[in-house]
């Protein structure tokens, strides 16, 4: 992508190949000297978009919002030129990408692993929850079906209950959580585990490294922000407040905890609350 930016600065259009002449200039203070030797570099620019939409939505009969343009499903933008959405799609029905949730929007569609501009439409073979990642700078897209999201309890080294998809980019589930008694106290560390339909997995943990529980932090606090994390048992985890220890010998016997993982916001986050 760096060479792609160099090609753009040199005036090459998307997908075009050109040969550039480059050299080195050294400077110190106000003085600069250009090297006498130069080299040639041939670059083929990636097939991307010159004008990247400021926002992106999914609309169509396959989407959660249906054909109503005002109910188009908004995508998040985790990085410059990139968009992403977790959403349910109906198999055999169609959807497209638009730059605003209104009639007359600019339209894009997915063709294989490429993003195309124009009045095309896209389908998925089966109904399911999908993660769609789009990079407009190189016109590429990855579509993966999410089979499940689970609460991962670090002391057990395992997922203990599932968070079903409930719509609008949110996974939500509830169960009793029993902190694990250790010699030093009760262990309450956790993160999340996402499994894709192909069997691959992705852990989701804290975006802001922490080794404490949230205390009185509000649900909007950055403490709860989530991000993709490495495949391991202990790193980048959170800690639950004592009120969520529903074990018979815990702080709140019988407590049922409700957890929501939320992907429909700029900073992906999660919410923990008592269900009962």
Which residues does each PLM region occupy?
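Insoluble glucan recognition modules
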Residues: 1-276
């Amino acid at each position: 992508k760096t060479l792609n930016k160099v090609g753009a600065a040199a005036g090459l259009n998307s997908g075009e190949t050109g040969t550039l002449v480059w050299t080195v200039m050294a400077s110190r203070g106000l003085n600069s000297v250009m090297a006498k030797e130069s080299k040639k570099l041939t670059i083929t620019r990636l097939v991307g978009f010159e004008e990247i939409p400021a926002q992106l939505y999914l609309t169509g009969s396959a989407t959660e919002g249906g054909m109503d343009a005002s109910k188009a499903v908004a995508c998040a933008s985790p990085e410059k030129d990139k968009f992403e959405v977790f959403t349910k799609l109906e198999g055999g029905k169609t959807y497209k990408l638009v730059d605003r949730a209104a009639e007359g929007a600019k339209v894009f569609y997915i063709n294989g692993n490429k993003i195309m501009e124009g009045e095309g439409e896209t389908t998925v073979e089966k109904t399911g929850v999908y993660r769609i990642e789009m990079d407009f700078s190189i016109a590429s897209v990855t579509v993966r079906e999410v089979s499940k999201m689970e609460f991962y309890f670090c002391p057990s080294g395992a997922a203990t209950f599932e968070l079903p998809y409930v719509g609008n980019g949110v996974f939500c589930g509830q169960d009793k959580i029993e902190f694990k008694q250790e010699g030093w106290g009760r262990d309450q560390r956790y993160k999340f585990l996402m499994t894709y339909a192909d069997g691959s997995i992705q852990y989701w943990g804290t975006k802001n490294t922490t080794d404490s529980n949230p205390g009185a932090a509000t649900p909007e606090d950055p403490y709860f922000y989530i991000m993709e994390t490495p495949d391991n048992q202990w790193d980048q985890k959170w800690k639950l407040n004592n009120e969520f220890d529903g074990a018979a010998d815990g702080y709140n016997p019988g407590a049922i905890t409700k957890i929501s993982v939320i992907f429909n916001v700029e900073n992906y986050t999660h919410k923990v609350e008592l269900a009962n």
